[in-house]
């Protein structure tokens, strides 16, 4: 009896295990201004296609996410959207400018109007047509921590069809 239960449990656990299916691509030449560890993280994220970069304060998350977004936009010829808190949007645009990555702000109530890297804040995401996106970056993804949060569920639902995220 105990062996049957253990066997059933092992089967159950094996069914729950998920294997990573690569959805990414080999990145091109990444910017020289990335440190070696940042380059490796961006390469890893590009190869996965769907990845999360959880790096400590001061390790260059913004530069890494913008480098990834720029690679996706270049690879697909499409639109990549960065969703960020309003307070960090301008800082992200400035950092992109500093490192040669153009980041355009989505007009209020609008949607990205062409290929490239775009940014808007979480409060404006309802105006975005996510079916037009080729990539999505969630800056300050702590917004996803509230497992019962409405914003979290809206993002999950909207991002289902975005190939790179």
What is each residue range found by the language model?
Residues 3-55, 59-164:
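SF2 helicase/translocase NTPase motor core
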């Amino acid at each position: 009896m105990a062996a049957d239960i253990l066997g059933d449990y092992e089967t159950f656990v094996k069914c729950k295990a998920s294997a990573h299916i690569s959805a990414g691509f080999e990145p091109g030449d990444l910017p020289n201004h990335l440190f070696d560890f940042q380059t490796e993280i961006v390469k890893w994220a590009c190869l996965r296609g769907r990845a999360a970069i959880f790096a400590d304060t001061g390790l260059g998350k913004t530069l890494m996410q913008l480098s990834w977004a720029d690679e996706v936009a270049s690879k697909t010829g499409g639109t990549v959207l960065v969703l960020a808190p309003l307070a960090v949007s301008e800082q992200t645009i400035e950092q992109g400018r500093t490192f040669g990555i153009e980041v355009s702000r989505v007009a209020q109530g609008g949607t990205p109007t062409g290929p490239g890297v775009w940014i808007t804040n979480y409060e404006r995401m309802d105006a975005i047509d996510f079916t037009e996106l080729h990539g999505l970056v969630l800056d300050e993804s702590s917004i996803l921590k509230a497992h019962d949060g409405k914003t979290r569920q809206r993002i999950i639902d909207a991002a289902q069809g975005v190939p790179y995220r």
